[in-house]
Amino acid sequence: MKILGIDTSSMAASVAVIEDNKLICEYTINTKKTHSQKLMPMIENMLGLSDLNVREIDAIAVCEGPGSFTGLRIGMATAKAIAHVNDIPVIGVNSLEALAANMNLCDKKIFSILDAQRNQVYTGRYQYEGTKLVEIKEIGIQQIDELLEELAHSGEQWILVGEAVYKYEDKIREISNIEIPAASNNVTKAGSLCSVAKVKFDEGKDIFDCYTVNPLYIRKSQAEEQYEEKQRKLQEQK
């Protein structure tokens, strides 16, 4: 079974193909180019270098969020289009679980964090039970200072993974029971995304078609929140 993975949930764009449990190719770019500029050329180049035709792909694994609202929409639209044309399923994987999968078979508890702005982070907690990655607590959103205080007093060893690590690195390094992994593990890799998707497919979980898969938004976008605040103030003035 060949799975094409697509992740555009952050500044980095990543695509990959796995066949069963073997990584065939992975292509990650972290530049200022927009995802709309680079995503399709990345997919086409990767498939070409791998001597693969898109018709050989059996399923699409797409990062459903949380993450950049614009990035998620671009990745999701691309996944839907490829799935529609080739009549193949789409497997949704959240970005926090895919990040945790970068720490394959880690013996510590894994805390995935992504920047949610306003000193907040999207959070996901995971651990490996044997070879299986297990969610400890549902994904959510939390103030970074509250989160770090909670982990500092947890009495457990944690690995903190994700792009938000860099934003709050000075604070994180002050806490002795938190470890920061190598830089390459702090971006969502499409290869890890595909590995999580393969497990989900085998278990019959989170499998959609091109019409039913949608981004996972933990909260409303800033534009939506500003609009609602404006409407609330207008109502109060009446």
Report the location of each language-model feature.
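N-terminal beta-alpha supersecondary unit
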Residues: 1-64
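Short glycine-aspartate micro-motif
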Residues: 3-5, 61, 71, 110-113
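Short beta-strand scaffold segments in enzyme catalytic cores
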Residues: 12-18, 121-125, 216
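Surface "functional belts" at beta-alpha junctions
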Residues: 22, 34, 89-187
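Phosphate-handling active-site elements
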Residues: 50-55, 84-95, 205-206
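DPxDG-like acidic metal-binding loop motif
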Residues: 59-90
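Acyltransferase
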Residues: 181-238
